[in-house]
């Protein structure tokens, strides 16, 4: 029912970009058509409806959300083809996630694990998070064993390696290369038993792939995670505040927006941690509000709920990782 299918580059990589693709229908029209069709088959597609509900809690990322539906559609139709005795491509579902810190990469990985478990693509759907230190050992053979152990824990689920390019930073003699070689071998030997997601900054991930040309073809799905706009960051802040049963005063809201505009314009994108940055500001502001109330003698419901301008933590919070 969706007009736009997943598009492929010449090298077979699924091209999932979250900005500005032309479509036959407008996004609103396509979504309306899609929802109408889904409503007719609600019982059949209950898994997708549940995932969509969880994705609706994520601010922005509209293209990513549509593409998750496309991956669902592709798997679902392949299952129907298999039932009819038609050929079904046994394509691996290993992925690359490219984006700056705090843009939702880990959250989306968890959702994909849940979706694939419900669709019987993965037997467990759990997420194992790892970084260089979890894979690279201290002597010859140690790295391969650590990597194999991590893959074993990931069987039936997703192995999510953050800042994956750090595995290639030490040169030919670095044990990181041994980790890469071990991952590649198991991606082939056990390609339908687990899903490997490599994540990190876009530029570094592209450079990492250029140094390891054989890797790119092994990751058929690549998803870009753009930075949040100030408007989206404010929406994230309001949702965090609401979830905790607080509210921002008008002055606090203005101050936070001005602060986010300043930080966004003066901080390098790779050092700004997006949603995590906002969360840190909100959590510190809640503690500051508690200190302010402790020094006073009023504990009305409105006092306990309101974050005032002076409560806002607006020191430099701009660093963070994936």
From Swiss-Prot:
Q: Which CDD domains match?
A: AAA (cd00009)
* Keywords in alphabetical order: ATP-binding, Nucleotide-binding, Sporulation
Question: For this UniProt entry, which segments traverse the membrane?
Answer: none
Q: Does the keyword ATP-binding apply?
A: yes
Annotated residues that bind ATP are located at 99-106
Which one GO biological process term can you cite for this protein? sporulation resulting in formation of a cellular spore
| Iron keyword on record | no
Q: Which SMART domains has this protein been placed in?
A: AAA
Q: Name one Pfam family in it.
A: AAA
Recorded GO terms, molecular function? ATP binding; ATP hydrolysis activity
Q: SUPFAM superfamilies recorded for this chain?
A: P-loop containing nucleoside triphosphate hydrolases
Please give the InterPro entries that the UniProt record associates with this protein: AAA+_ATPase, AAA_lid_6, ATPase_AAA_core, CbxX/CfxQ, CbxX/CfxQ_RuBisCO_ESX, P-loop_NTPase, Spore_V_K
Q: Which family does it belong to?
A: Belongs to the CbxX/CfxQ family.
Looking up PANTHER family in the UniProt record yields: AAA-TYPE ATPASE FAMILY PROTEIN / ANKYRIN REPEAT FAMILY PROTEIN, AAA-TYPE ATPASE FAMILY PROTEIN _ ANKYRIN REPEAT FAMILY PROTEIN
Name under which the protein is recorded: Stage V sporulation protein K
